[in-house]
Amino acid sequence: MMSKPHHATLESIKYTPGSLRLLDQRKLPLETVFDDVLTVEDIWSAINEMRVRGAPAIAVSAALGIAVATQRKVANGELKSGSEVQAFFLSSCDFVMTSRPTAVNLFNCLRDLKEQVEKLDPTKAAAEVAQACVELAEAVYTKDVAFNEGIMRHGAAHILAVAKAEGRDKVSILTICNTGALATSRYGTALGVVRQLFYDGKLERVYACETRPWNQGARLTVYECVQEGIPCTLICDGAASSLMLNRKIDAVVVGADRICQNGDTANKIGTYNLAVSAKFHGVKLYVAAPSTTLDAKTASGNRVEIEEREPTEITTNMVTKQRVVADGPHLSVWNPVFDITPGELITGGIITEKGVQAPTASAPYYDIASIIAQP
């Protein structure tokens, strides 16, 4: 029987009607700073500059940010009719979708919102249309919390069942990046699974890759684990293969920014490395993500646009802002934020709020459309 998840103590999205504050995750763990989101430009910048990050959190923040900006414009008289409110909300969705290219949650969320807002009656008063937009945006947050709860319960129960069949009562998990409460509305996806195992007393230890160059594992995942007392070991990214060789790892559990129709998965750079090594060492790899991350319209990973960021993220110390790499005319820097893990290497399964989908025995290993179609 699956356990009920506990209440996570961390909160990166603080929302009340008319107000949105986002935790600036670039400053963690040294500083805890919340930024007010007042305009559509504010939410675009927060996403683009990675003050808010994690595919589910980006989508939720975008929806709420646009809603708050709409409310403010109605309150100060800039939007005087229902049709103006509707037009502003729709154009804001289009604008915010340009903030980052790879995570499909943002696009799925805002496209769905647009479809619903387009159905609103523009002849109604501005305040009434704005309130309807706000309620639609708030539903995005509520739904993501429920998705997190489903993912963590299904994932933990499945992984524990596999371990018990092999005679083990506790499990050790390897993960990358940050996929917890800081990356979602509350509990997390991959780290949510880890949380549930911990709450159930079944987690031996989670191993967190530091996740260069932004160090989301070292800065954020470790921060979450320390806050909740979750047993955690931080490792360098390059130590993952050696870890799987020398210590018992029951599963690699990662998040996703986009899962294509055939199971190919875009996730934080370094995930592909983990998948290759896990396959070699016989360790099951799972992808944990809400159904909003599933992209049945994109056939395979070679059709996904991979975001590349500034070279300074690699050459400059994040805290001191000093350059720590020699410079010269023949030096170039390649800084992709994501990589593509082929569905063939997702050997454990895809964990969503609907359950765990195991791979088939031969290609294509996954049928994402069939998962989406499940109730």
Swiss-Prot record:
Pfam families in alphabetical order: IF-2B (PF01008)
Catalytic activity: 5-(methylsulfanyl)-alpha-D-ribose 1-phosphate = 5-(methylsulfanyl)-D-ribulose 1-phosphate
GO CC annotations, alphabetized: cytoplasm; nucleus
Record-level GO BP terms: L-methionine salvage from methylthioadenosine
GO molecular function: S-methyl-5-thioribose-1-phosphate isomerase activity
Enzyme class: isomerase
Enzyme Commission number, as recorded: 5.3.1.23
Protein localization: Cytoplasm; Nucleus
Site feature: Transition state stabilizer: 177
Pathway(s) served: Amino-acid biosynthesis; L-methionine biosynthesis via salvage pathway; L-methionine from S-methyl-5-thio-alpha-D-ribose 1-phosphate: step 1/6
UniProt-listed PANTHER family: METHYLTHIORIBOSE-1-PHOSPHATE ISOMERASE
Role according to the record: Catalyzes the interconversion of methylthioribose-1-phosphate (MTR-1-P) into methylthioribulose-1-phosphate (MTRu-1-P).
Family recorded in the similarity comment: Belongs to the eIF-2B alpha/beta/delta subunits family. MtnA subfamily.
Name of the protein: Methylthioribose-1-phosphate isomerase
Native source organism of the sequence: Leishmania infantum
Classification of source organism: Eukaryota, Discoba, Euglenozoa, Kinetoplastea, Metakinetoplastina
